[in-house]
């Protein structure tokens, strides 16, 4: 059973590859950058949608990259047979759909369009499929949300703490890897939300990140009036700051029922912010 993985060098692939090796499943990892082969993993150079070498039939294809290029490659890749397909989207497909920021609404539209194109390609090819919509990802030190905050705090010894009452549900990258394996074994043929095993306020989430750091940092509460000022003065922060009091959570009931995956609660430690 050979598994092709796009995005294998990313934060979820960091956890998926060792788990596939532990199952004894050969892996073909596709990357734009060269990598040395390792036991059970063969790396090939390629990029979606039109710079991927011809692949012989495989049992499963996993993609952690942009959906639309992957869907378009898959639709034209008849040589792969009818493998099981697992791909990640994002809960931003929902949470940013009604954003006040046009660029964020466009992100949501592209995610939804990519999901639709992938499902259509799978149905034409007769592939079983699962699309995972994770919430805020952490755990490998490669995310663009919590890790930059943690590293900045370690450099400056100060941790800005926005006061946000909206709920968050961070999901560990390894739990997405576990969900991927479950979807290979039991394809759901649907889009599944994937949040962490715990919901907490944005303020509590930032507090736990601060407590996880390997050195003491000074908490700097950011008052609401300052957040409003920054929201209007810095356009690129308008969307994220507007969502501080919004609930950005996932309903894991279908994930648990169909894949029997139960993500861990949010208990970060210092290793979560180290580059994996």
Region spans (language model):
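Residue-level signal for the nucleotide or nucleotide-sugar donor/cofactor binding architecture
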Residues: 109, 144, 168-171, 200, ...
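Active-site Tyr-X1-5-Lys
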Residues: 105-130
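N-terminal Rossmann-fold cofactor-binding loop
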Residues: 29-34
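Flexible, glycine-rich beta-alpha linker
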Residues: 130-148
């Amino acid at each position: 059973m050979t598994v092709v993985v796009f995005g294998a060098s990313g934060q979820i692939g960091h956890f998926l590859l060792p788990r596939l090796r532990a199952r004894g499943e050969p892996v073909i990892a596709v990357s734009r950058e060269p990598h040395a082969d390792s036991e059970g993993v063969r790396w090939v150079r390629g990029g979606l949608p039109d710079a991927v070498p011809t692949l012989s039939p495989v049992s499963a294809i996993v993609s952690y990259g942009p959906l639309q290029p992957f869907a378009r490659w898959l639709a034209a890749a008849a040589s792969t047979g009818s493998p099981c397909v697992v791909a990640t989207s994002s809960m931003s497909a929902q949470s940013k759909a009604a954003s006040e920021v046009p660029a964020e609404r466009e992100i949501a539209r592209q995610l939804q369009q990519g999901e639709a194109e992938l499902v259509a390609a799978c149905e034409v090819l007769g592939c079983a499929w699962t699309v995972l919509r994770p919430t805020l990802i952490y755990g490998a030190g490669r995310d663009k949300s919590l890790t930059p905050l943690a590293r900045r705090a370690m450099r400056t010894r100060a941790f800005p703490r926005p006061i946000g009452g909206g709920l968050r549900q961070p999901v560990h990258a390894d739990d997405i890897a576990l969900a991927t394996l479950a979807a290979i074994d039991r394809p759901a043929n649907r889009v599944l939300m994937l949040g962490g095993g715990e919901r907490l306020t944005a303020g509590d989430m930032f507090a736990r990140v601060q407590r996880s750091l390997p050195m003491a940092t000074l908490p700097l509460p950011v008052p609401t009036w300052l957040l409003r000022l920054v929201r209007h003065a810095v356009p690129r922060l308008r969307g994220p700051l507007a969502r501080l009091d919004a609930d950005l959570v996932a309903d894991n009931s279908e994930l648990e029922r169909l894949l029997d995956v139960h993500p861990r609660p949010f208990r970060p430690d210092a290793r979560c912010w180290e580059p994996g």
